[in-house]
Amino acid sequence: KESAAAKFERQHMDPSPSSASSSNYCNQMMQSRNLTQDRCKPVNTFVHESLADVQAVCFQKNVICKNGQSNCYQSNSAMHITDCRESGNSKYPNCVYKTTQAEKHIIVACEGNPYVPVHFDASV
């Protein structure tokens, strides 16, 4: 079974995107990372930083997660991210996404030993 840490990497890590600037980026990535297998995942964020930099966030500013848990952390610096949001004309299995690039601080939930990101909570 895929570990929570490996699932985070599959769903959210893209350190050196070849085509993040393309409007088709989300359509391609959501499909290739299996985020449209049994439904169209409505919203997903990809982070274009090294895995080490994202894992380091687990030791940065401790914040409360959206669900009320206390194991979320906010990055000290803004990171290059791409937000993928399902567009109105999207219908499974033909999932269609809008691609939006941004520079924002990320908030991730961390757990385990080693202590690593397992959930992308928000960007601010």
Swiss-Prot record:
Underlying gene: RNASE1
MF terms (GO), sorted A to Z: lyase activity; nucleic acid binding; ribonuclease A activity
Entries under PANTHER family matching the protein: RIBONUCLEASE (PTHR11437), RIBONUCLEASE PANCREATIC (PTHR11437:SF24)
Gene source species: Capreolus capreolus (European roe deer)
Segments for region (Disordered): 1-25
UniProt binding sites for substrate: K7, R10, K41, P42, V43, N44, T45, K66, R85
Name by which UniProt lists this protein: Ribonuclease pancreatic
Active site: H12 (proton acceptor), H119 (proton donor)
CDD domains according to UniProt: RNase_A_canonical
Positions of disulphide bridges: C26-C84, C40-C95, C58-C110, C65-C72
Function: Endonuclease that catalyzes the cleavage of RNA on the 3' side of pyrimidine nucleotides. Acts on single-stranded and double-stranded RNA.
Basic and acidic residues bias (residue ranges): 1-13
SUPFAM superfamilies: RNase A-like (SSF54076)
InterPro entries from the UniProt entry: RNaseA, RNaseA-like_dom_sf, RNaseA_AS, RNaseA_domain
Expressed in which tissues: Pancreas.
Reactions the enzyme catalyzes: an [RNA] containing cytidine + H2O = an [RNA]-3'-cytidine-3'-phosphate + a 5'-hydroxy-ribonucleotide-3'-[RNA]; an [RNA] containing uridine + H2O = an [RNA]-3'-uridine-3'-phosphate + a 5'-hydroxy-ribonucleotide-3'-[RNA]
GO cellular component terms, A-Z: extracellular region
Any single biological process term in GO: defense response to Gram-positive bacterium
PROSITE patterns: RNASE_PANCREATIC (PS00127)
Entry keyword set: Disulfide bond, Endonuclease, Glycoprotein, Hydrolase, Lyase, Nuclease, Secreted
Localization (cell): Secreted
Quaternary structure, from the entry: Monomer. Interacts with and forms tight 1:1 complexes with RNH1. Dimerization of two such complexes may occur. Interaction with RNH1 inhibits this protein.
EC number: 4.6.1.18
Family: Belongs to the pancreatic ribonuclease family.
